[in-house]
Amino acid sequence: MSDLAKLKNVGKAALADFAVLGVTSTAQLAACEADDLYVKLCALTGQRHDPCVYDVFAATIHQARTGEVLDWWVFTPSRKERMKAGNFCRI
């Protein structure tokens, strides 16, 4: 089992997304930025993904970096504020 699968917000869909992105470990994930992963996933798959995918990326990166376990929806309000301000990932 990948150590990514041990992170709180990682299920089958997130594991599949990480595979598409080439992210194979928690250590590698810790060096990533959620914005970059989201934009890259959309580009590689040729489709815009639900913004909640970004929230999952943010939560898992946070856990990988700090060890603090937070639900993915904790990151939703800040993402929505960025979207409202026009500062969310440009695809």
PLM features: residue spans?
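C-terminal extensions
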Residues: M1-K8, K12-I91
